[in-house]
Design a protein with these regions (language model features):
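N-terminal start-of-chain detector that recognizes signal peptides
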Residues: 12, 22-26, 61-63, 91-95, ...
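Extended Gly/Ser/Thr-rich low-complexity repeat segments
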Residues: 42-43, 79-95
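A generic local structural motif
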Residues: 16-18, 87-89, 108, 127, ...
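Short, surface-exposed interaction patches in beta-rich subdomains
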Residues: 17, 45, 64, 75-80, ...
Length: 210
């Protein structure tokens, strides 16, 4: 039986709107700051610049350029009901970002096949999965959320700073939990990964096994 709410939503203002502007061709960084909803970021063949598809009943999602950063932001508001937006960000195939920042309150975010020189993830109670390539430093901070990184490369390509409460952090074959102080692992690598976890979970997987 169909949920009557669904039909209301479909006939309401929750159409998908596609946002793209010539200025997006200048984007070197992508900054996504969303309070709730479902976000998907992936590469797409046949487009020349970043494109954002937004389905947001309350039209709170904003996309704009700030110098060389494309910002996709959504302010939390007091909304009736729990209608969460769906946002799809398409990046041209082979387009390497200088930096990808994901700040998710309670949102669910999947990033697939994206290459960036720096990755920053901050989540409260959300769930984030990043599958792709990071040719640089990684910072992950989660409260009670779940973050999974599926990275190209190997575990010894990074140095690590790991901080963990009652949650757990898995990096390749290493497992960390209930750390009384920040743990540093120096692999004499060119890049550093900072992982900070409260009661959530962070899992980092690599496609090259040591």
């Amino acid at each position: 039986r169909d949920d009557p709410d669904d039909t209301d939503r479909a006939s309401g203002s929750s159409q998908v709107s596609t946002v793209s502007d010539p200025s997006y061709a200048q984007a070197r960084k992508l900054d996504v700051d969303i309070d709730k909803g479902v976000i998907r970021v992936s590469e797409k063949e046949g487009i020349s610049q970043i494109q954002v598809n937004v389905q947001d009943t309350y039209n709170r999602t904003q996309c704009y350029m700030d110098e060389f950063t494309l910002k996709v932001k959504r302010e939390s508001g007091r909304s009736r009901g729990n209608e969460a937006p769906r946002i799809e960000i398409l990046i041209p195939a082979g387009y390497g970002l200088d930096k990808l920042s994901l700040d998710m309150g309670a949102a669910e975010c999947t990033v697939l096949g994206v290459t960036t020189s720096k990755l920053e993830i901050d989540t409260g109670v959300g769930a984030i999965t990043f599958s792709g390539t990071v040719n640089g430093d990684v910072e992950v901070e989660t409260g009670v959320g779940d973050v999974t990184l599926n990275l190209t490369g190997s575990q010894d390509g990074y140095n690590y700073q790991v901080e963990c409460g009652v949650g757990s952090i898995d990096v390749g074959a290493e497992h960390y939990t209930m750390l009384s102080h920040e743990t540093h692992i120096n692999n004499k690598a060119p890049y550093t990964m900072e992982l900070e976890c409260g009661v959530g979970n962070i899992a980092v997987n690599f496609d090259q096994i040591l």
